[in-house]
Amino acid sequence: MGNSHTTASSTADDTTAAADPANLQEYNSVAIPPGGIITILSIDGGGIRGIIPGTIVAYLEEQLQALDGPDARVADYFDVIAGTSTGGLMTTMLAAPDKNKRPLYAGKDLVPFYKEHGPKIFPSAGIFETVRDTTRLLSGPKYDGKYLHQLLKNLLGDTRLGQTLTYVVIPTFDIKTFQPTIFNTCDDSPEKNAKLYDICIGTSAAPTYLPGHYFETTDANGTKVEYNLVDGGVAANNPTLVAISTVTQRMVTKDPKFLLDNTSKQPIGCHRFLILSIGTGTAKYGSKYTAKQAAGWGVLGWLSQGDGNPLIDVFSDASSDMVDYHIATIFQALNVGDNYLRIQEENLRGTASSVDISTKENLNALEQVGKNLLKKAVSKLNLFTGQYEPIEGAGTNQDALKRFAKLLSEERKRRITVSAAGGQ
C-alpha cells in the first residue's frame, strides 16, 4: 500500500506563508524553482475498478481544498500525472483543459463519472448472452467499445496531448511495432502530440475486452506516422516507473524544468521526488485461481473463468507488483522511503475483483472499498518477505494523504513565492 510521508516537509521553504492562497487557482506552471521537489501522481489500470483510486483522488483533492480553497485541483499540485488504461482516462480527466483553461474534472467528479458511464461501457449480459459472449471471446472482443469511443470524443474533442495543464504520461502498447508507446507531454516530437481522445482509447483497449485502436499523426516532415494500440497495461499497468523514467530522461537532456538549479545544471536527485501511486485493487489474498485449476485450462479457460480473465489478471497484477517492488527497493535503499506512498487494496473479493462488472451493487461496493482503504493503516513493502506491513505510528492512509496534501500545498506556495520574486 505504501509509505508514510514525514521527512519531505523539510523541502518546503519558510517563506511559503507569504503566498496568498487566493491566487492559487491562477497559477498553473509546471516549472520547478531552485530547491524544489518533483511531484508525481500515478494511477494503475483496472477497468471499472478505477472507482477505487477515484475515491482516493477525491479525498486528496478535498484536503487540498481545505488548505487552499475550493478552486484547488489535483493538476495544480503535481508536475506529472501518469495513468494506464482506466488510470489514463482519469489522468486525462484531471489534466485536460476546459474552456476556461482549468481541469476538465474535479477529483470529486471521478466516481460519479464511472457510476454513470460504466454500465454503458461494460453493459451487463443476461444468462444466454453470457454463454454467447464466452464463446465469442475466440473471435472478437467482449465489448464493441462504441459507447466509450463516442463518450471520449464528445468529452475531449480535438484537444491534444500538448494542451494538458500539467505533464501527463500515458503508456500504450503498439502491436505492429511490438513495443510500448509512451505518450507524454515531455516529448516534443510532433508525431506524439496526438489527440487525447485517441490516446485514451488506445491505452484502454484491453485485449479480449475492447478492440485495438488505430490512428495516424504526422511528424515534423509531414510524413504519416501510424499507431496500432492496445491497452497500456500490457506493458506497464502500474505507470509509476514510466513516470520516473520520463522525468529522468528530461534530466539527461538538461531540461531546465528538471534541473536542481540554473547555475550548476545538476539534475534533481531521487531524494527530491514525492510520489503518490494508487492501485485499483487486487485479489492477492482471495485465492482467485489455483494451479490445480489452471492445469486443466486451454485457450478458452485462460480467457474466461467466472467473472475474470486469468491471462489479463495475471500479467496486469504481476506488472503492478513488480513496479512497486522496484521503486520501494530503490527508495528504501537510498533512505528516502518516506517520499513514496503506495495505496493499494490487496484483498478484493468476488465481483469486486472484476474489471468489467458494472452492476449498481458492484459500483457501490467498489466505492466502499475505496472509502475503507482510506481507513486502513499505512503500510510499506518488506523487501525480504515481499509482504506489506503496517508502519508503526504512521496512522491510516487518510492520515498519510493529509500529510501529503500539506506537503503539496507548501511546495506550491513556495513556487508562487519564488515566481513572484522573479524566480530567485
Language model region names:
Residues 2-424:
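Conserved catalytic cores and adjacent C-terminal regulatory segments
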